[in-house]
């Protein structure tokens, strides 16, 4: 009185499809949260967003999306270290909290791999976050 092979195959397919759907939903929710957090920081318009950060979101020929997000996470991670947090961000704890949340969310989407952020060019945090928002929106639309 066991399962027929056909029924077992159908049940296995349903299980796999359900798992893929759930993972896709989690990923989409994560992307929406990241975009929402980026919007929150960009709307605040504090002087803190005029600070300079490495311009790591410049895509070159060999740059993958995963590589860009790895470098973006490295830039955002610097806001975790108290000695690297500027006085402006210390006085705007809401912005600092969102930047830390962004770092966690992005690193959850793409677990950390080894990447370098040594770039001679700088950009404002505001421009960096705006470009990061564009990348996240493209990922969200591509599904």
Swiss-Prot record:
The organism's place on the tree of life at top rank: Eukaryota
InterPro entries the UniProt entry points to: 4_helix_cytokine-like_core, IL-4, IL-4/IL-13, IL-4/IL-13_CS
Cited SMART domains: IL4_13 (SM00190)
Residues annotated as signal peptide: 1-19
Principal cellular location given in the protein's record: secreted
Localisation: Secreted
Keywords recorded for this protein, A-Z: B-cell activation, Cytokine, Disulfide bond, Glycoprotein, Growth factor, Secreted, Signal
GO cellular component: extracellular space
GO molecular function per UniProt: cytokine activity; growth factor activity; interleukin-4 receptor binding
GO term, biological process aspect, one: B cell activation
Disulfide bonds: 48-88, 70-115
PANTHER family associated with the record: INTERLEUKIN-4
Family: Belongs to the IL-4/IL-13 family.
Function, in words: Participates in at least several B-cell activation processes as well as of other cell types. It is a costimulator of DNA-synthesis. It induces the expression of class II MHC molecules on resting B-cells. It enhances both secretion and cell surface expression of IgE and IgG1. It also regulates the expression of the low affinity Fc receptor for IgE (CD23) on both lymphocytes and monocytes. Positively regulates IL31RA expression in macrophages. Stimulates autophagy in dendritic cells by interfering with mTORC1 signaling and through the induction of RUFY4.
Protein's name according to its UniProt entry: Interleukin-4
Source taxonomy: Eukaryota, Metazoa, Chordata, Craniata, Vertebrata
